[in-house]
A protein has these predicted regions:
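Juxtamembrane/start-of-transmembrane alpha-helix segments at the extracytoplasmic/lumenal side
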Residues: 1-5
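Short boundary/linker motifs that mark transitions into or out of structured domains
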Residues: 6-74, 132, 138-139
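DNA-binding patch around the recognition helix
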Residues: 46-52, 116-147, 263-274
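Short amphipathic alpha-helical recognition elements used for nucleic-acid or partner binding
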Residues: 67-101, 121
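Intrinsically disordered, charged and Pro/Gly-enriched terminal/linker segments
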Residues: 71, 85, 106-109, 141-281
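Short beta-strand->alpha-helix linker/helix-N-cap micro-motif
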Residues: 90-100, 105-106, 130, 134, ...
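A conserved beta-strand->loop->alpha-helix hinge within the catalytic CA
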Residues: 113
Length: 281
């Protein structure tokens, strides 16, 4: 068993983040290795009291554990997210906030509706411990303290100083794409910036998981990448290789076929690489 593990580690390390020619050990041995060396796929972070989760479906949970997401009307959600996104750079001014959410209203009218909106938002956040909407130095910010939690805030902290092998990041990202149910054009740029940061980190994570023969979480990384870019060639290569290493070649072929069908639909041409090309190169 030791020589199998050593052999895989040496081969994977030589891969160095690019897809070089590589053949896996026969299916029976690889399946045994994967089951003995690694545990299950990392699970998504669960909702908990005093939490605001933005990856996957936006979820707001009170101190009592009640899901209070439905209290956020469209305007309240926009206000919360705009303030939250700007908090990292020092907050957002009243004028800027009004200009983004109520661009057609005169200053006096927008001031009144802004005041009502912010008061209603504070009432909702007051049902959570450790979350405060405050106005400081002329700008609105959202502050999180114990025991409150926000996956967006934690993800930025991790991504700022990222190194592969981070289970916490994968647990956050496993919930789903950032603001996956939100089609508000107001947040398109912000979502794109988060997607870019996530994709860069998860590609490095996938390479690290693969080089350490962590097949299940290599597949998880591939799934995360494909949510961001359904035609990510790196992602489908990782998925095909890792699933085959786990003895799940049928599933690998299903995913490959789905990929090439989507590729054909989007580009009106056949995908150049065969299943075997991805598996062995």
């Amino acid at each position: 068993m030791q020589w199998i593990i050593l052999g895989l580690t040496v081969i994977a390390a030589g891969w160095g983040g690019s897809f070089l020619r590589m053949r896996f050990l026969r299916k029976g041995r690889v399946s045994l290795l994967a089951s003995e060396k690694h545990g299950a796929r990392i699970r998504p972070r669960k909702d908990g009291p005093d939490s605001l989760l933005l990856f996957g479906s936006l979820t707001l949970t009170s101190s009592s554990g009640e899901d209070i997401t439905s209290l956020l009307t469209g305007r309240l959600k926009e206000t919360l997210l705009l303030i939250l996104f700007h908090t990292r750079s020092g907050g957002i001014s009243s004028r800027r906030l009004s200009g983004l959410i109520w661009p057609d209203k005169e200053e006096e009218k927008s001031k009144n509706v802004r005041g009502v909106t912010l008061n209603n938002l504070r009432k909702i956040l007051n049902r959570m411990e450790g979350v405060k909407l405050v106005f400081e130095e002329g700008k609105y910010v959202v502050r999180f303290g114990e025991p409150a939690y926000c996956d967006y805030v934690e993800s930025l902290s991790i991504l700022d100083d990222y190194s592969p092998g981070n289970d916490r990041l994968l647990s956050i990202l496993a919930r789903g794409k950032f603001l996956k149910d939100d089609g508000d054009l107001l947040f398109d740029k912000m979502k794109a910036e988060i997607d870019d940061k996530v994709a860069s980190a998860v590609l490095a994570e996938a390479q690290w998981r693969f080089s350490n023969a962590d097949w299940a979480n290599t597949v998880l990384c591939a799934d995360i990448l494909l949510r961001i870019d359904p035609l990510s060639e790196n992602a489908i290569k990782f998925a095909v290789k890792a699933l085959s290493a786990m003895g799940q070649e049928d599933e690998a072929r299903v995913r490959y076929n789905n990929f090439i069908n989507q590729y054909k639909k989007d580009y009106d041409e056949e995908y150049a690489s065969s299943f075997d090309d991805l598996l062995h190169h």
